[in-house]
Amino acid sequence: MREIVHLQTGQCGNQIGAKFWEVVSDEHGIATDGQYKGNTDLQLERISVYYNEVAANKYVPRAVLIDLEPGTMDSVRSGAFGSLFRPDNFVFGQSGAGNNWAKGHYTEGAELVDSVLDVVRKEAEGCDCLQGFQITHSLGGGTGAGMGTLLISKIREEFPDRMMATFSVVPSPKVSDTVVEPYNATLSVHQLVENSDETFCIDNEALYDICFRTLKLATPTYGDLNHLVSIVMSGITTCLRFPGQLNSDLRKLAVNMVPFPRLHFFMVGFAPLTARGSQQYRAITVPELTSQMFDAKNMMAASDPRHGRYLTVAAYFRGKVSMKEVEENMLSVQNKNSNYFVEWIPNNVQTAHCDIAPRAHKMSVTFIGNSTAIQDLFKRVADQFTAMFRRKAFLHWYTGEGMDEMEFTEAESNMQDLVAEYQQYQEAHMDDEEAEEAYEDEAPPEE
């Protein structure tokens, strides 16, 4: 089977990752001790994608947990699912990266990276046919951002032909933990543009907004935010974990979603999201799901898709839905909003379906969009970066770890290039002649 090795780095990555494993274990009927307690063969059919069967009916996640300080690891280990993970797969340092990207990437993280790679190698050797890696991390800190990107590039070196998917929590304008987030994020994006195949962008502000507006939570906790992230991660990976018609592995998803290799940053969304109190008053129908899924308020990254155009979209429907109805609704959305979809990629909306609904829903849909509006997010970080870098504020923390100012300048211009590329494809229209030629190219020759 096509296995995926999961890595989680830093505090954020480990907390999201732990939540992800809770949701996935629940969907596959695996108890906290790794015993299978499920009730349908569908749960086991492709379980080897994420789990290793170590004994009769005992499953262990293919997960590597990494941090530069022991704190978060201890809380994962003492949590409900702590005994699920293989004890050797906890790799941690003692010093912490102190929100310093350079520490994660060049000094502290670089010391730990070889022992992490040993564990990764071991996991990869236990796979039949490894399809790739997924990593959960944040881009604003030191370990997740600095060491996370170091790991990505090292794994890239060693497994050049395997897919690399990242679930990256992007710093948001209103919810900021540290003042150097723009530095860490820009340096990380500089790495991700080159080394990742698909990056799912999530940001705390958008998650807070969803909790306030849609779920009507007065004081959302990080637990609530992580729960949202884990629902989306579970949705994105549905097609990898369960048998389905459009049987996407990571590579097929990338082929459908990435028109140009650098533009692989996706917005994600999930529907139905309803406040707990009003759940029983709403019938969940396919049109309802489709409209909520494309709603700007539903995006888990703080960019408004109405500011750009979709290059490609993938929608994963789960549960008992009529595919005919789904196709009709998806088409009508495209026809009504045709100027929000680029016309030079025909059939740029892909729909997949999996019969198994997530817990607590009869049907649901997960949205993945490659929209040029994601440039808002990069612009915002770039502006904050420039404001500080112009004054060389806080730079000594990075140069003290052996970094060069040149690297900052490079990262800054790479990010600006990325924004410019998105803008270029947003404005690209097909000329009439081009359109005719494209149409002629597409028409199969008569035989």
UniProtKB/Swiss-Prot annotation:
Any Gene Ontology biological process: microtubule-based process
PROSITE patterns the record matches: TUBULIN, TUBULIN_B_AUTOREG
Compositionally skewed regions (Acidic residues) per UniProt: 430-447
A Pfam family annotated for this UniProt entry: Tubulin_C
Residues binding GTP, per UniProt: Q11, E69, S138, G142, T143, G144, N204, N226
GO molecular function: GTP binding; GTPase activity; metal ion binding; structural constituent of cytoskeleton
Keyword Metal-binding: yes
Keywords assigned: Cytoplasm, Cytoskeleton, GTP-binding, Magnesium, Metal-binding, Microtubule, Nucleotide-binding
Family matches, as InterPro entries: Beta-tubulin_BS, Beta_tubulin, Tub_FtsZ_C, Tubulin, Tubulin/FtsZ-like_C, Tubulin/FtsZ_2-layer-sand-dom, Tubulin/FtsZ_GTPase_sf, Tubulin_C
List of residues binding Mg(2+): E69
Gene3D superfamilies on file: Helix hairpin bin, Tubulin/FtsZ, C-terminal domain, Tubulin/FtsZ, GTPase domain
CDD domains, per database record: beta_tubulin
Keyword Kinase recorded: no
SMART domains membership: Tubulin (SM00864), Tubulin_C (SM00865)
Cellular-component GO terms for this entry: cytoplasm; microtubule
Stretches for region Disordered: 427-447
Chief location bin: cytoplasm
Entry's localization field: Cytoplasm, Cytoskeleton
Cofactor: Mg(2+)
Family membership: Belongs to the tubulin family.
Assembly information from the UniProt record: Dimer of alpha and beta chains. A typical microtubule is a hollow water-filled tube with an outer diameter of 25 nm and an inner diameter of 15 nM. Alpha-beta heterodimers associate head-to-tail to form protofilaments running lengthwise along the microtubule wall with the beta-tubulin subunit facing the microtubule plus end conferring a structural polarity. Microtubules usually have 13 protofilaments but different protofilament numbers can be found in some organisms and specialized cells.
Alphabetized PANTHER family for the sequence: TUBULIN
Function according to Swiss-Prot or TrEMBL: Tubulin is the major constituent of microtubules, a cylinder consisting of laterally associated linear protofilaments composed of alpha- and beta-tubulin heterodimers. Microtubules grow by the addition of GTP-tubulin dimers to the microtubule end, where a stabilizing cap forms. Below the cap, tubulin dimers are in GDP-bound state, owing to GTPase activity of alpha-tubulin.
Name by which UniProt lists this protein: Tubulin beta chain
Species this protein is from: Uromyces fabae (Rust fungus)
